[in-house]
């Protein structure tokens, strides 16, 4: 309590508040959020592309202009070679000037094999130091940054609380990548708030949650995509946002090296009164 100043209520009544600062669509700077998707959907590449944009790169995803600032991306699941492949693929879509801007503004520190644990004092302090002076920190994935039971609300509240403490003290937003539950993935419900694997605290205690979901057979039919091509399409949206106007979900197409770019799709009209196969 001693570290937090009380709010001057009369001053808040009278003075106009400063505008909200968004680090990602609907995500206020200095808060904690999540990107949830099934394994293999492309969330690591999406996170890398968003990190590169905030670091000073172009808006390849067409999610809108985002204020720039230093970013740190901590992949603890993939080896450096895999990160190199993603960067090489992404670099093919950047100009020399854009490459330099991203290199200057983005720090990538692979942690595979380091067993990071945000609940351990030395790791908490190290992550806090890494966040200082930065606009965004990406943790890839949440499971790699703690050793607690994911289905237990108490331990998960503490894990989220550690992230909130870092964000509050440094002003750096934290986005953790997380897997969708098997049930949500099988039912094509990856765009729902409760698609997140583990305790509901992982949804309830954060201010922002986005998703990346693979195209289902029904969606492929709706958008006129051949079934053997739908694996190239993923949908990105925000399933929980405590601030800001609604963010419209959008389709991305996976290109060489896994790079995501906006997909050009047209919703198909349904025929009326004509049985399938007779049109």
From Swiss-Prot:
Give the matching Pfam families: AAA_25
InterPro entries, per database record: P-loop_NTPase, RepA
Q: Which domain of life is it from?
A: Bacteria
The biological process GO terms on file are:
plasmid maintenance
Q: Does the keyword Hydrolase apply?
A: no
Gene3D superfamilies attached to this UniProt entry: P-loop containing nucleotide triphosphate hydrolases
> What molecular functions are annotated in GO for this chain?
ATP binding
**By its UniProt entry, which CDD domains does this protein fall under?**
RepA_RSF1010_like
Q: What SUPFAM superfamilies has UniProt attached to this entry?
A: P-loop containing nucleoside triphosphate hydrolases
Keywords of this entry: ATP-binding, Nucleotide-binding, Plasmid, Plasmid copy control
What the protein does comes down to:
This protein is involved in regulating the plasmid copy-number. Increasing the level of this protein results in a higher plasmid copy-number.
Q: What's the name of the protein?
A: Regulatory protein RepA
Q: What is the lineage of its organism?
A: Bacteria, Pseudomonadati, Pseudomonadota, Gammaproteobacteria, Enterobacterales
